[in-house]
């Protein structure tokens, strides 16, 4: 009988019998894997309200002690299991689940429901490039224009045709007039496309910014975003998790009012989790603090309970009061007392109104109606506020009181699929629905939207039927057939095993299936373009005869392209650090030589170690580009008064304008605030940065245009690459300390090498923030002649490093 309970059928028993000799050992193994986390030792909220502060304190401390005991005994094991389930690193989990017993409970509830984290930068964000029909039209125009150029270069010897549009049945080719019309249409489309792209999600200052902002949060999303730009201390991971646990309300005829009121309900428990439950940390040495915390805890739960059952009249009243004080919940970051929490909830009514205005059109669009019809009513969503309120009451009690069991080996299924698999498939459908909505209802980049939209809807409908009637593997294969690879790039590293093609033998190709390498590459190019160009050139050109990496044969093992290297980075633990993208990549490069990523969410082995990237030149170049990016950002946000020196200083140009020493008592000199003097242990860094900041592909294209002889062209390209390779080798071998002025003037970033003797000179000038007489400044230095020093100052003035002002 025990076997029947533990193992559902004989085939499963045979499978497990090889590992366990008896049902009792099976039971023991199964039980040891289950985590049981008790809630507050209180029956319900009614009993909670009847307790005094001392009793509540005792119950909270009991919960804290029991949770800490579990973490002490099985914490490492638990974090490992949760890491795989939630797609987070152990370090991230450790910080979050140890904040409060209620935080751990929220994470476990989410894990039980198959909720996982996708990486913000690795999940392909929808933008106008996802209009696939537009790309086909662009390709057509490119062919037409190429054919036109070929016709002109051939001297008109061949009659203008469109052979690629003719078939074997001798159908009429496209007329010249029609070809020109297509080109004009494409030019108009391009203008509209560029405008839409400027307002869409893109990389800004090394961060992937979701635009418009309303798209950053959707209550009906199935998974949670891990955003590395969010500081650890203020991150809202548990808030997002509880938002997913809170579900949502939807029906085909959902009114504005229904959506608004349900959106308000949706945010109640997540706000309680973020501002109250996550911060329950009693200080046993301070009764006053504990009293405040307990009162806040109790009053907030009472307030949330009342809000769940709030009447329409109360909502009208709150709306009217918000009209006179137009705030959102984001304006209050820290909760100091129960009153502040009530303000957050009351102000969130503004957020709910904004949410309804931004999303009602989306959730009632055809693609989303089709998608929502695949969800399970009263399980994935609710059709009425009345049912939804009952669900929220139950969720609140579960978070507070119920024992939560987490079994990482659980086979609890929905329609034969594990919870995560079920959500993964729904997520792919939802991503495609969102793409169709954005392309056809928002971007409007298609001139024949109706026809293409109907075609795409049929594909989505087919996949919906496949979801209901076919296995997971069949669904994935059909998804690969009907969906773009960009849609499969869901940012869920723990979905690779489900998404990879069974016929694929390339491990790197498999590891990039669920992540958008192109999007991450764009991000790296946006912040460290020279480093990316250096690595790409080195990977292509390094060999045993031209060693550009620190390996015997000049090659990086299993790295044949820049994409391969970035894929390794995307699958490492460094992608999850809360640092800038450039610094995460820098740490990955530095540690790849001697560290195996044992703390990743994916399996690791010896192939994760990249030998040959241990040269410090990469870190130096990345740090330099970081400085350039910082200067560019400061310049973009510039307050005019901050750069008054560059704006008001005289600028010496021709030699006739140069100042002679005898005239130096007529000028004041002052150091620019836009430049810093930096010491770097590499005298080749500036030249390396300059070389790889240029477009190397364009340089090759110029050679191809100028040189028609194939042998001469190959010789020139070889010489060109050898010259660049020498710069790389020289920079890799250089360790000479060198000083550089790094700064920005007239929107141009400059990296200027300067003699080492300038360090005390610059420090002297900086010690006079209001400037000093040019003659006095020159007289204070002795390492070169006054004329040579003045000449250097003149050059620095041209770049804006120092300001010169005629003395009144």
Swiss-Prot record:
Keyword annotations of the record: Chemotaxis, Coiled coil, Mitochondrion
Transmembrane segments: none
Physiological role: Required for efficient chemotaxis.
Protein name stated in the entry: Protein tortoise
GO cellular component: mitochondrion
Keyword Mitochondrion included in the entry's annotation: yes
Stretches the record annotates as Disordered: 152-171
UniProt organism field: Dictyostelium discoideum (Social amoeba)
Deletion phenotype: Mutants have no defect in cAMP signaling or motility, but are unable to respond to a spatial gradient with directed movement.
Subcellular localization: Mitochondrion
KW Lipoprotein (keyword) present: no
Predominant location category: mitochondrion
UniProt record, GO biological process: adenylate cyclase-activating G protein-coupled cAMP receptor signaling pathway; aggregation involved in sorocarp development; cell migration; chemotaxis
Chain segments annotated as coiled-coil in the UniProt record: 43-78, 694-733
């Amino acid at each position: 009988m025990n076997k029947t309970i533990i193992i559902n059928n004989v085939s499963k028993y045979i499978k497990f019998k090889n590992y366990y000799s008896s049902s009792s050992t099976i039971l023991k193994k199964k039980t040891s894997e289950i985590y049981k986390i008790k809630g507050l030792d209180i029956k319900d909220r009614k009993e909670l309200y009847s307790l005094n502060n001392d009793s509540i304190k005792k119950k909270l401390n009991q919960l804290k002690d029991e949770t800490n005991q579990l973490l002490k005994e099985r914490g490492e094991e638990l974090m490992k299991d949760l890491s795989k389930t939630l797609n987070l690193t152990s370090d991230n989990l450790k910080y979050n689940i140890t904040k409060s017993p209620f935080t751990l409970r929220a994470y476990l509830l989410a894990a039980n429901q198959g909720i996982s984290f996708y990486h913000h930068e690795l999940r392909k964000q929808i933008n106008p490039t996802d209009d696939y029909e537009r790309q086909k039209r662009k390709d057509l125009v490119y062919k037409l224009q190429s054919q036109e150029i070929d016709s002109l270069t051939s001297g008109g010897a061949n009659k203008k045709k469109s052979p690629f549009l003719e078939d074997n049945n001798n159908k009429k080719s496209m007329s010249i007039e029609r070809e020109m019309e297509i080109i004009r249409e494409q030019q108009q489309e391009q203008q509209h496309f560029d405008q839409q792209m400027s307002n869409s999600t893109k990389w800004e200052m090394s961060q992937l910014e979701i635009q418009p902002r309303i798209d950053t949060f959707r209550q009906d999303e199935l998974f949670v975003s891990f955003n590395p730009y969010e500081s650890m201390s203020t991150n809202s991971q548990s808030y997002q998790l509880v938002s997913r646990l809170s579900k949502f309300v939807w029906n085909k005829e959902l009114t504005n009012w229904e959506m608004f009121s349900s959106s308000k309900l949706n945010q109640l428990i997540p706000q309680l989790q973020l501002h109250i439950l996550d911060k329950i940390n009693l200080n046993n040495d301070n009764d006053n603090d504990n009293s405040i915390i307990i009162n806040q805890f109790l009053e907030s739960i009472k307030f949330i309970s009342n809000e769940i059952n709030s009447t329409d009249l109360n909502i009208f009243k709150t709306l009217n009061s918000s009209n006179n004080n137009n705030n959102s919940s984001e304006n209050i970051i820290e909760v100091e007392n129960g009153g502040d929490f009530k303000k957050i909830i009351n102000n969130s009514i503004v957020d709910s109104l904004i949410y309804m205005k931004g999303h009602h059109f989306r959730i009632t669009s055809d693609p989303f109606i089709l998608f929502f019809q695949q969800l399970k009513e009263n399980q994935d969503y609710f059709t009425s506020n009345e049912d939804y309120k009952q669900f929220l009451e139950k969720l609140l009690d579960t978070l507070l009181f119920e024992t939560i069991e987490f079994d990482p080996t659980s086979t609890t299924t929905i329609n034969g699929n594990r919870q995560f698999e079920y959500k993964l498939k729904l997520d792919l459908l939802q991503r495609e629905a969102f793409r169709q909505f954005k392309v056809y209802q928002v971007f409007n980049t298609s001139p024949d939207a109706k026809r293409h939209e109907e075609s795409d809807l049929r594909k989505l409908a087919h996949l919906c039927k496949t979801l209901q009637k076919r296995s997971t593997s069949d669904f994935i294969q059909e998804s690969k057939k009907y969906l773009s690879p960009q849609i499969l790039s869901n940012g869920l590293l723990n979905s690779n095993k489900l998404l990879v093609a069974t016929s694929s033998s390339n491990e790197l190709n498999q590891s990039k299936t669920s992540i958008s390498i192109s999007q991450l590459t764009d991000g790296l190019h946006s912040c460290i373009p020279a480093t990316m160009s250096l690595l790409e050139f080195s990977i292509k050109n390094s060999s045993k005869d031209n060693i550009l990496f620190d390996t015997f044969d000049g090659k990086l093992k299993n790295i044949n392209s820049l994409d391969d290297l970035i894929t390794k980075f995307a699958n490492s633990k460094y992608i999850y650090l809360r640092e800038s993208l450039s610094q995460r990549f820098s740490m990955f490069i530095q540690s790849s030589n001697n560290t195996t990523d044992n703390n990743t969410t994916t399996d690791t082995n010896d192939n994760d170690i990249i030998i040959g990237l241990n040269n410090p030149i990469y870190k130096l170049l990345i740090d330099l580009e970081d400085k350039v990016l910082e200067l560019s950002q400061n310049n973009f946000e510039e307050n005019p008064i901050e750069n008054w020196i560059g704006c008001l200083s005289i600028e010496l140009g021709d030699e006739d304008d140069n100042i002679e020493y005898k005239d130096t008592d007529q000028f004041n000199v002052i150091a620019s605030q836009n430049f810093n003097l930096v010491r770097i242990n590499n005298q080749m860094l500036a030249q390396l940065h300059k070389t790889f900041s240029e477009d190397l592909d364009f340089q090759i294209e110029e050679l191809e245009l100028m040189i028609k002889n194939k042998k001469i062209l190959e010789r020139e390209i070889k010489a060109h690459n050898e010259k660049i390779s020498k710069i790389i080798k020289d920079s890799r071998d250089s360790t000479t300390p060198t000083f550089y002025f790094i700064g920005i003037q007239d929107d141009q970033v400059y990296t200027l090498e300067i003699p080492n003797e300038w360090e005390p000179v610059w420090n002297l000038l900086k010690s006079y923030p209001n400037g000093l007489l040019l003659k006095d400044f020159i007289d204070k230095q002795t390492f070169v002649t006054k004329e040579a020093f003045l000449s250097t100052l003149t050059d620095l003035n041209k770049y804006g490093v120092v300001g010169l002002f005629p003395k009144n």
